[in-house]
UniProtKB/Swiss-Prot annotation:
Phytochromobilin binds at C360. The gene is PHYD. Homodimer. Belongs to the phytochrome family. Residues 25-55 have a biased composition (Polar residues). This is Phytochrome D. Residues 1-55 are annotated as: Disordered. It comes from Arabidopsis thaliana (Mouse-ear cress). GO terms for molecular function: identical protein binding; phosphorelay sensor kinase activity; photoreceptor activity; protein homodimerization activity.
Length: 1164
C-alpha cells in the first residue's frame, strides 16, 4: 500500500555479517543493536498494559513477524513458488520466537541491499583520503567515463575504479566544494552541492551523508547547467512550500481531519503525483488511510486499514533516519554496487535516496498499478519514557506518527530541491499536527477529569454501585461497548457484557494468573491467555479491568475491531474476488480484517490513565468505608495536617515573592506595573533612570494617558486589555515619554512582556511589564531601513549601539553580515557571504536546535522576502564555539529604489542576563504557585471522605438518647463539621471580592455559635496554659437571630484564634459579647452584637494586622485568613477593628442581625 522502499515484508537489502572499524555508528548498527537487545530482554520483562513500554513490546513482536514473512518470501523466490502474503500473515504467530541471527540477517538485508535505482549513481568515498571504495555500476556511464568508440592502444585505463581519487572525476570548482563539505560537522545541511563531471561538464546534484565506512554521495542529474538557475529553482520550491505551510497555519484549530485533507491537496499541487494519502499508524502498529487526494479515475483507498506488516518496523526506522523516500520506476532493473574487497560487509544505504526497493515491494507496487512513489515521514513528539518513567528526550523522543504517500501511474522523478521543500512542508505539518494532538489530548483530559469529578460526587452521595446504576456511569469514562462493576459479590453490568457465570470465570482466571497485578488491559482476551475467550464471541474481545480490592473489580469491554472499520471509498462488490497471492490494497485490507477478527480497538494510554485514576479514588474510598470508625476518630487530625502543608506552602511562596520583589527593585532592566485601572503601582529604579520620572512621581499616573506617546496608545490599550483577561502579550514595543531637563522631549523605546499580576485567590489585579531598553537599537534600525545610500559605515560600525545585522537576497543567500554579527557568532563575514542562510549559515555554521527550528526560520525568512515582516521572533542558536545564544529576530523586507522587494534585513536582539534572570524567577514562582494549588486541590478533595464519616457519625448520635450536655456537645460537633464543609467548598473564593458570595439566611441561637467558636480554640488555650474568660449574658445565649450561622462562626473563630495564638503564655484571653436591640425603619427589630476579644500586651503582630486590611497582598497564611474573614464579615454588614491600648489589645467586631418577631429582648 505504502511506498517506502520496504513496505510489505522488507525494504530490500541483501545480508552479510561483520563490520569494519569506523568513526561513525551507522543507522543499520543502531537498528540491529536496539532490535537485538530488545528481543533478548523481551521475555525477561513483565507485561505492561499501557504507555511507552507496551508500544515498544508490540514493535518488538512486529520485528519477529516481519523477519519471518521476509524469510518465507525469500524461500518462495528460491523454490519458484508464489508468495501468498495473506496466508503467510494469518499463519505467522506473534508469540513464537525467531533466532537472533535471523533478525540480524533480516535487518542487514533491509539496510545493506547492495543495489541502487538507475535514475542516479552512487559513489562511496573514504573520508580522509577521498579514495573511492565503492560505486554503482552505472556511474561510469553517467559521468561520461565510458568510451563511445572502439578503444585504441593509446587509451588510458578506466578512470573510475576502486582506489580512484574522487577529485579527479569533477571540475576543480566542484571538488573544492566537496572538500569543504567533507570537513563540515553536519554534512547533510549542505545538500545539494552543485558539481560538474570533469569529462562531460554535465551538472549533478551531489547529496552527501556519512556512513560507517566513509561518505556516500548520491549523484542525480540536474536539469540545467546554470547553478544560479538551480538556486532560484530551489528557492521557488521553498516559496511554494512556505505558501502551503501558511495555508496549514491559517486553518482553524481542533480539526485534525481538515489538517490532513489540506496537506494532501498541498502536496499533490506541489509534486503533481496522481494520488496523495495520509497514512496513520495506530498504537497497535497497524495503518489506516485517513486522507486522500487523487485523480478522479483512480479507485479510492481512504478508510482502508492495513496490517502492521505492510510497513515493517525496519522500514519505519529508516523513515526516521531518511524522511523522504522516492521510487522512480518499480519496473526499472536495480543497479549493483561495486565495492572494495577489503570491506567486510555491504555498504549501508540507509541514507541514500537511490536505495533500490526490495523485490516484494516492487511486486506490490506493480499489482496496484503504481509505478512511481514518494513517501514522506510525519514526525511528532513522542514523549517516550524509559523503564523508570523518565522522559528520554532527544532524537529518540520523536515518534513516527504516519506517512504522506504519493503514487503515480507512470515513472516520475522529483528533483532534490523539490523533495527538500516537501520535507520542510512535512516538518511544518508535523509541528501543526503535534499541536492539534496536544489540544485534543487536553480536551480529552478535561472531559475525563470532569467525568471523574462527577463519579467522585456519586461516591460521596450514594453507595459505590451508583457509578454503574446512575448517569453518568463508568461507561462514559472511556470509549467502550460495555462496562461492569463486581462489588461485594454483586454484579452490575452495563451495555455489552459477559453473563454472571462468565464474569465469575474471568475473575477466577484473573486471580489465578494475574494475582500480582492491579489490573489488566488487552485487545484480545484470547491472545491474553483466557481459555474460554471463544465462548464470548465477537461481542466481547477486549477488556480493561481495575482491581479495587481482592473481591471488587471494575470492567470495561470492547467488541471486535471489524465493527469499527468503515470503508470510505467505493464499495467492494461481493463477486470481486481478491487474489490472496497477489499483494494489493484490498487483499491487505481483507488480511487486516482476518488478523483483527478477534481483537478490539487498542486501549489508549490516556484511557488507561483515566481508569487508573478512578481505581485509586475508589481504593481510597473503600479504605475509608472499611475503617469508618477509626477514620472518624482521627478526622480531627486531618485539618491541622492540611493547615501545616498550606502554611509551609504559603511560606515558600512568600519567600519566592520577596525574592522576586528584591530582584525587580534592583534589576538593571526596566520593570513597571499597573493596577486594573491602568494606573502605575510599581516602578523600579531602572525605568525611573531611563524616563527621568522618580518612583514617587510615577505612582498613580495613568500609563496610557500620561506616559505613552499618542501613536502607541491603541497598542498599549490592547495589551492591557488582553493581559487583564489572562492573555499575556510578549515582545511588544512601547514608546514612553521622558521627564526632566536632560531627557525632556526625547522618547524611550522599550520592548515589554506583559505578565498578569494575580492575588492569592488567583484573581487578576493588575499587569506587570518586564522590558528591554531598545532605544538605541530602534533609532539605528529606523535610520538603517530608511537610508537610501551607502549604509555600510553604519552597520559595520563597532559602536555597541549597532545591533547584529545580516541580510538576505531574494534567493535567501547571505548578502550582508555586519561587525556585530561577526562578534556574536564568531564567523567572519568572508565565510558566510553568498552562502544560503537556511541550512548553510544557520544550520551548518550556526547550528539550530533541530529541524523544526530550521523550518520555522525558513518560513519567516521567506515571509519577509514576500513582504510580510516579522517582529521579535525567538531565534536561539549555537555560535562557532558551541555556546548557546538566545536571541530575538526581527525581519523586514529589503526594497529597491523603484519599490521592488529584493530581499530581507534581519536584526538580532539579545536579551540582557538580568532580564533572563527575572523571567526565570517569574517562571519558578508561577511553577511553585501552580504546584501548591494542585496540593491544595488534593487536600480539599481527600478531606471530603473523613467529613462524610463525621457527618455519618453525627447522624447516628442524633438518633441516640442523649442528655442536655451531650446534645450541646453534639450540636457543637455538627456546627464545626458544617464549617469545614463550607471552607472546603470555597475553591472559588474570588466571589468574596466581587460581591457574588452567597450567604445563607437561617434562624439560629447565638449560644450555639459561641460554643462552636470556643471549642475551636480550646486545644491552643490548653497548650499555652491560658485562661479563657467568657463574659456572655445568659439570656443572649438563648437569643434567636437570622443570618448565616456557619460563616459567622468561621469569622469569629479565626479572630479569636489569632488573639489566643499571640496572648502571653500563662496569661488570659477575654471574650465579651454586648447586645443592643435596635428598631429598624420597616418595623422589624435587629440586634447589634459587639464582640470584644482581648489579651494583654501587643497581641497580634502589626504585619498580620496589615495583611487583614490589605486587599491583595499578604505575608503569611494567618494574614490571608484574617483578610478573607474581614471580607466575609463586610458582606454580612459587619466590621472589625484592631485596637491597641495601654498593656492590652483587642479585636472589636460589630455585626447587626435581624431578630424574629416573637423574640423579646431585655434591655441591655
Amino acid at each position: 500500500m505504502v511506498s517506502g522502499g520496504g513496505s510489505k515484508t522488507s525494504g530490500g537489502e541483501a545480508a552479510s555479517s561483520g563490520h569494519r572499524r569506523s568513526r561513525h555508528t551507522s543507522a543499520a548498527e543502531q537498528a540491529q543493536s536496539s532490535a537485538n537487545k530488545a528481543l533478548r530482554s523481551q521475555n525477561q520483562q513483565p507485561q505492561n498494559h499501557g504507555g511507552g513500554t507496551e508500544s515498544t513490546n508490540k514493535a518488538i513482536q512486529q520485528y519477529t513477524v516481519d523477519a519471518r514473512l521476509h524469510a518465507v518470501f525469500e524461500q518462495s523466490g528460491e523454490s519458484g513458488k508464489s508468495f501468498d502474503y495473506s496466508q503467510s500473515l494469518k499463519t505467522a504467530p506473534y508469540d513464537s520466537s525467531v533466532p537472533e541471527q535471523q533478525i540480524t540477517a533480516y535487518l542487514s538485508r533491509i539496510q545493506r541491499g547492495g543495489y541502487t535505482q538507475p535514475f542516479g549513481c552512487l559513489i562511496a568515498v573514504e573520508e580522509s583520503t577521498f579514495t573511492i571504495i565503492g560505486y554503482s555500476e552505472n556511474a561510469r556511464e553517467m559521468l561520461g567515463l565510458m568510451s563511445q568508440s572502439v578503444p585504441s592502444i593509446e587509451d588510458k585505463s578506466e578512470v573510475l575504479t576502486i582506489g580512484t581519487d574522487l577529485r579527479s572525476l569533477f571540475k576543480s570548482s566542484s571538488y573544492l566544494l566537496l572538500e569543504r563539505a567533507f570537513v563540515a560537522r553536519e554534512i547533510t545541511l549542505l545538500n545539494p552541492i552543485w558539481i560538474h563531471s570533469n569529462n562531460t561538464g554535465k551538472p549533478f546534484y551531489a547529496i552527501l551523508h556519512r556512513v560507517d565506512v566513509g561518505i556516500l554521495i548520491d549523484l542525480e542529474p540536474a536539469r540545467t547547467e546554470d547553478p544560479a538557475l538551480s538556486i532560484a529553482g530551489a528557492v521557488q520550491s521553498q516559496k511554494l512550500a512556505v505558501r502551503a505551510i501558511s495555508h496549514l497555519q491559517s486553518l482553524p484549530s481542533g480539526d485534525i481531519k481538515l489538517l490532513c485533507d489540506t496537506v494532501v491537496e498541498s502536496v499533490r499541487d506541489l509534486t503533481g503525483y496522481d494520488r496523495v494519502m495520509v497514512y496513520k499508524f495506530h498504537e497497535d502498529e497497524h495503518g489506516e488511510v485517513v486522507a486522500e487526494s487523487k485523480r478522479n479515475d483512480l479507485e479510492p483507498y481512504i478508510g482502508l486499514h492495513y496490517p502492521a506488516t505492510d510497513i515493517p518496523q525496519a522500514s519505519r526506522f529508516l523513515f526516521k533516519q531518511n524522511r523522504v523516500r522516492m521510487i522512480v520506476d518499480c519496473y526499472a532493473s536495480p543497479v549493483r554496487v561495486v565495492q572494495d574487497d577489503r570491506l567486510t560487509q555491504f555498504i549501508c544505504l540507509v541514507g541514500s535516496t537511490l536505495r533500490a526497493p526490495h523485490g516484494c515491494h516492487a511486486q506490490y507496487m506493480t499489482n496496484m498499478g503504481s509505478i512511481a512513489s514518494l513517501a514522506m515521514a510525519v514526525i511528532i513528539n513522542g514523549n517516550e519514557e524509559d523503564g523508570n518513567g523518565v522522559n528520554t528526550g532527544g532524537r529518540n523522543s520523536m515518534r513516527l506518527w504516519g506517512l504522506v504517500v504519493c503514487h503515480h501511474t507512470s515513472a516520475r522523478c522529483i528533483p532534490f530541491p523539490l523533495r527538500y521543500a516537501c520535507e520542510f512542508l512535512m516538518q511544518a505539518f508535523g509541528l501543526q499536527l503535534n499541536m492539534e494532538l496536544q489540544l485534543a489530548l487536553q480536551v480529552s483530559e478535561k472531559r475525563v477529569l470532569r467525568m471523574q469529578t462527577l463519579l467522585c460526587d456519586m461516591l460521596l452521595r450514594d453507595s459505590p454501585a451508583g457509578i454503574v446504576t446512575q448517569r453518568p456511569s463508568i461507561m462514559d469514562l472511556v470509549k467502550c461497548n460495555g462496562a461492569a462493576f463486581l462489588y461485594q459479590g454483586k454484579y452490575y453490568p452495563l451495555g455489552v457484557t459477559p453473563t454472571d457465570s462468565q464474569i465469575n470465570d474471568i475473575v477466577e482466571w484473573l486471580v489465578a494468573n494475574h494475582s500480582d497485578s492491579t489490573g489488566l488491559s488487552t485487545d484480545s482476551l484470547g491472545d491474553a491467555g483466557y481459555p474460554r475467550a471463544a465462548a464470548l464471541g465477537d461481542a466481547v474481545c477486549g477488556m480493561a479491568v481495575a482491581c479495587i480490592t481482592k473481591r471488587d473489580f471494575l470492567f470495561w469491554f470492547r467488541s471486535h475491531t471489524e465493527k469499527e472499520i468503515k470503508w470510505g471509498g467505493a464499495k467492494h462488490h461481493p463477486e470481486d474476488k481478491d487474489d490472496g497471492q497477489r499483494m494489493n490494497p484490498r487483499s491487505s485490507f481483507q488480511t487486516f480484517l482476518e488478523v483483527v477478527k478477534s481483537r478490539c480497538q487498542p486501549w489508549e494510554t490516556a484511557e488507561m490513565d483515566a481508569i487508573h485514576s478512578l481505581q485509586l479514588i475508589l481504593r481510597d474510598s473503600f479504605k475509608e468505608s472499611e475503617a469508618m470508625d477509626s477514620k472518624a476518630a482521627a478526622a480531627g487530625a486531618v485539618q491541622p495536617h492540611g493547615d501545616d502543608m498550606v502554611q509551609q506552602g504559603m511560606q515558600e511562596i512568600g519567600a519566592v515573592a520577596r525574592e522576586m520583589v528584591r530582584l525587580i527593585e534592583t534589576a538593571t532592566v526596566p520593570i513597571f506595573a499597573v493596577d486594573i485601572d491602568g494606573c502605575i503601582n510599581g516602578w523600579n529604579a531602572k525605568i525611573a533612570e531611563l524616563t527621568g520620572l522618580s518612583v514617587e512621581d510615577a505612582m498613580g499616573k495613568s500609563l496610557v494617558r500620561e506616559l505613552i506617546y499618542k501613536e502607541y496608545k491603541e497598542t498599549v490599550d490592547r495589551l492591557l486589555s488582553c493581559a487583564l483577561k489572562g492573555d499575556e502579550g510578549k515582545n511588544v514595543e512601547v514608546k514612553l515619554k521622558t521627564f526632566g531637563s536632560e531627557l525632556q522631549g526625547k522618547a524611550m523605546f522599550v520592548v515589554v512582556n506583559a505578565c498578569s499580576s494575580k492575588d492569592y485567590l488567583n484573581n487578576i489585579v493588575g499587569v506587570c511589564f518586564v522590558g528591554q531598553d531598545v532605544t538605541g537599537h530602534k533609532i539605528v534600525m529606523d535610520k538603517f531601513i530608511n537610508i537610501q545610500g551607502d549604509y555600510k559605515a553604519i552597520i559595520h560600525s563597532p559602536n555597541p549601539l549597532i545591533p547584529p545585522i545580516f541580510a538576505a537576497d531574494e534567493n535567501t543567500c547571505c548578502l550582508e553580515w555586519n561587525t556585530a554579527m561577526e562578534k556574536l557568532t564568531g564567523w567572519p563575514r568572508s565565510e558566510v557571504i553568498g552562502k544560503l542562510l537556511v541550512r548553510e549559515v544557520f544550520g551548518s555554521y550556526c547550528r539550530l536546535k533541530g529541524p523544526d527550528a530550521l523550518t520555522k526560520f525558513m518560513i519567516v525568512l521567506h515571509n519577509a522576502i514576500g513582504g510580510q515582516d516579522t517582529d521579535k521572533f525567538p531565534f536561539p542558536f549555537f555560535d562557532r564555539k558551541g555556546e548557546f545564544i538566545q536571541a530575538l529576530l526581527t525581519l523586514n523586507k529589503r526594497v529597491s529604489i523603484d519599490g521592488k522587494i529584493i530581499g530581507a534585513f534581519c536584526f538580532l536582539q539579545i536579551p540582557s542576563p538580568e532580564l533572563q534572570q527575572a523571567l526565570e524567577v517569574q517562571r519558578r514562582q508561577e511553577s511553585e504557585y501552580f504546584s501548591r494549588r494542585k496540593e491544595l486541590a488534593y487536600i480539599f478533595q481527600v478531606i471530603k471522605n473523613p467529613l462524610s464519616g463525621l457527618r455519618f457519625t453525627n447522624s447516628l448520635l442524633e438518633d441516640m438518647d442523649l442528655n442536655e450536655d451531650q446534645k450541646q456537645l453534639l450540636e457543637t460537633s455538627v456546627s464545626c463539621e458544617k464549617q469545614i464543609s463550607k471552607i472546603v467548598g470555597d475553591m472559588d473564593v474570588k466571589s468574596i471580592d466581587d460581591g457574588s458570595f452567597l450567604l445563607e439566611r437561617t434562624e439560629f441561637f447565638i449560644g450555639n455559635v459561641t460554643n462552636a467558636v470556643v471549642s475551636q480554640v480550646m486545644l491552643v488555650v490548653r497548650e499555652r496554659n491560658l485562661q479563657l474568660i467568657r463574659n456572655i449574658p445568659t439570656e443572649v445565649k438563648s437569643m434567636a437571630v437570622y443570618g448565616d450561622q456557619i460563616r459567622l462562626q468561621q469569622v469569629l473563630a479565626e479572630f479569636l484564634l489569632s488573639i489566643v495564638r499571640y496572648a502571653p503564655m500563662e496569661g488570659s484571653v477575654e471574650l465579651h459579647l454586648c447586645p443592643t436591640l435596635n428598631q429598624m425603619a420597616d418595623g422589624f427589630s435587629a440586634v447589634r452584637l459587639e464582640f470584644r476579644m482581648a489579651c494583654a500586651g501587643e497581641g497580634v503582630p502589626p504585619e498580620k494586622v496589615q495583611d487583614m486590611f490589605h486587599s491583595s497582598r499578604w505575608t503569611s497564611p494567618e494574614g490571608l485568613g484574617l483578610s478573607v474573614c474581614r471580607k466575609i464579615l463586610k458582606l454580612m454588614n459587619g466590621g472589625v477593628q484592631y485596637i491597641r491600648e495601654f498593656e492590652r489589645s483587642y479585636f472589636l467586631i460589630v455585626i447587626e442581625l435581624p431578630v424574629p418577631l416573637m423574640m423579646m429582648m431585655p434591655s441591655s
